A protein has these predicted regions:
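A mature extracytoplasmic/lumenal domain signature
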Residues: 73, 93, 117-119, 132-134, ...
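Low-complexity, intrinsically disordered terminal/linker segments enriched in charged
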Residues: 159-199
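Early exported N-terminus immediately downstream of N-terminal targeting peptides
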Residues: 25-103
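Boundary of Sec targeting at the N-terminus
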Residues: 21-23
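Surface-exposed, charged secondary-structure patches
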Residues: 99-141, 196-199
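Sec-dependent signal peptide recognition
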Residues: 2-10
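Short beta-strand edge/turn micro-motifs at domain boundaries
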Residues: 140-142, 146-169
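N-terminal signal peptide c-region/cleavage motif recognized by signal peptidases
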Residues: 17-19
């Protein structure tokens, strides 16, 4: 699961908020405000690492469609599970996602971002394009945000594509590999998630 952490770190640094409020509902401005808010918060030396992590969790829960991401990454196996098992999976996935999101936050506290454009693919999806600006220690990194806009008043992030690599697809492939190697035993996946959460 370590191969996913670097992608989650990139979304982490844009989901920190110094105040709890609703962001603009227009996709490009929605992402732009998240980015600007993150930079302001992460550069504040008076905010502890623990507090930053708490802010990430709050903002992620409000602005990332974690449930939809979790169901997608589980794949077709979800159709074979009862409601109680799905509930357990959703709870574990949320904890896994949030821990991954905060795992290496401080490594990216000085990064600068730019929103470059927005491409409305349909009535319900817009791709917002951005990049991490090249620095002396890091190359430029292109990041595309898949923003779900079925509810026009509440956009949600459903995927992140970093240098062409989809966060959702990467996670789905990893979970699929674990399940396929263990006769689709969901309990093995639960153990893997719990190991990461408790590590």
């Amino acid at each position: 699961m370590k191969n996913l952490i670097s992608l989650l770190v990139l979304v982490a640094i844009t989901l920190v908020s110094s105040n709890s409020f609703s962001y603009n509902s227009e996709p490009k401005l929605f992402i732009e405000e998240l980015v600007g808010d993150a930079i302001k918060t992460l550069s504040d030396k008076n905010i502890s690492k623990a507090d930053k992590s708490k802010k990430i969790e709050t903002i992620a829960l409000e602005n990332v469609d974690i449930d939809a991401l979790g169901m997608y990454t589980l794949g077709v196996v979800r159709n074979t599970l009862d409601q109680e098992t799905l509930k357990k999976y959703n709870e574990l996935f949320q904890k896994y996602f949030l821990k991954s999101l905060t795992s290496r936050l401080t490594d990216y506290s000085e990064n600068k971002f730019e929103i470059t454009s927005a491409d409305q693919k349909s009535e319900t999806y817009t791709i917002v394009k951005s990049k991490i600006v090249k620095s002396s220690t890091q190359p430029e990194i292109k990041i595309n945000w898949r923003v779900y806009t079925k509810d026009l008043t509440k956009p949600l992030i459903r995927d992140l594509i970093v240098e062409g690599l989809s966060l959702a697809k990467t996670q789905k492939e990893e979970f699929s590999s674990i399940l396929n190697s263990n006769n689709n035993d969901i309990n093995i996946l639960f153990l893997k998630l719990e190991e990461f959460i408790n590590n």
